[in-house]
């Protein structure tokens, strides 16, 4: 756990090979990259806030793999982690983000007018649409490493900023610790609130310390715009609604996000960002846009088809179970979203989802009629 690692200097009394973790049964990005040599080279380093190599990798040591997705196996504890431990992070980022090089520059586009179509995904197949991202506030440690005081300060800042939103974004903040068990569970079941911190990835990285202190959810009155505070990231911004109007969801997302950033700037706070990695977040898998645009989509036939995984791969999409990352699909309903985060703009990623989902629906309709889908197979994007 972070904070117990203040004895990093004491560990250096042991040779690096005595401290090197056993990764022999591991299947995550960190385990693929971390060698005894790299460990020896980086283990004495720490960021200005005291985050060490062992803090970075602990979650990946404790969690060898995941049944549904290839996990990253490491986290950042502050903005400087990506620089101080770049010899570990850079190859992981390149591996996870489709060959994204240390010299590459990220691009941002939060103008919803640049999205082509997206307002007409068939609601007979698309049950709901959602776009989310994360944001980190510069000057604070990230959740694996932040103190109670930092976390409470982030919550206070977030609540002040969010309470200034108006129009259809106006809403209120609900602190986790003042919710009843039933209220919390209802919000989780409705997919509005993050789960209780039972995920081993959250626990092993130290993100669940002091739970539920200074955690909460802010949402507008009709629950189409939500902000999670102090879960895996300082802020998770989510726009969602029933049906297939991804254009509307994305427009609300861009408007709300831009307003939130402006409100933080008015208090002299900015979000962590740099030209190479885009928006800096706790998990390297979310760097860049941090954006996941997803739909819950009914594909009872295509979902069982042998080519389903190949189709998704070619469209640069990924599937999750109905209840999210740790679950299986129920009743032929899948959570389908963009696989990329970094190296593409927000508009490009949402466009991939919109175009890809249209094709998935066309394939599903063919299969309903007992027809072949070979001629619809997409080229690799």
Curated annotation (Swiss-Prot):
Protein name stated in the entry: Creatine kinase B-type
A Pfam family that the UniProt record links to this protein: ATP-gua_PtransN
Enzyme class: transferase
Catalytic activity: creatine + ATP = N-phosphocreatine + ADP + H(+)
Post-translational modification note: Ubiquitinated by the ECS(ASB9) complex, leading to its degradation by the proteasome.
SUPFAM superfamilies with a match to the protein in the record: Glutamine synthetase/guanido kinase, Guanido kinase N-terminal domain
Modified residues (Phosphothreonine): 35, 322
Gene Ontology molecular function, alphabetical: ATP binding; creatine kinase activity; ubiquitin protein ligase binding
Cross-link Glycyl lysine isopeptide (Lys-Gly) (interchain with G-Cter in ubiquitin): where in chain: 45, 101, 107, 381
Native species: Homo sapiens
Effect of residue 292 to H/L/Q: Complete loss of activity
Domain Phosphagen kinase N-terminal, first and last residues per copy: 11-98
Xref: InterPro entries: ATP-guanido_PTrfase (IPR000749), ATP-guanido_PTrfase_AS (IPR022415), ATP-guanido_PTrfase_cat (IPR022414), ATP-guanido_PTrfase_N (IPR022413), ATP-guanido_PTrfase_N_sf (IPR036802), Gln_synth/guanido_kin_cat_dom (IPR014746)
Basic and acidic residues composition bias: residue spans: 96-110
Gene3D superfamilies for the chain: ATP:guanido phosphotransferase, N-terminal domain, Glutamine synthetase/guanido kinase, catalytic domain
Sites of Phosphoserine modification: 4, 199, 309
Keywords tagged on the record: ATP-binding, Cell membrane, Cytoplasm, Isopeptide bond, Kinase, Membrane, Mitochondrion, Nitration, Nucleotide-binding, Phosphoprotein, Transferase, Ubl conjugation
Binding site for ATP: 128-132, 191, 236, 292, 320-325, 335
Entry's EC annotation: 2.7.3.2
Protein family: Belongs to the ATP:guanido phosphotransferase family.
Localization of this protein: Cytoplasm, Cytosol; Mitochondrion; Cell membrane
Cited CDD domains: creatine_kinase_like
Residues reported in the UniProt entry to bind creatine: 72, 232, 285
Residue numbers spanned by region Internal MTS-like signal: 130-138
Any GO CC annotation of this UniProt entry: plasma membrane
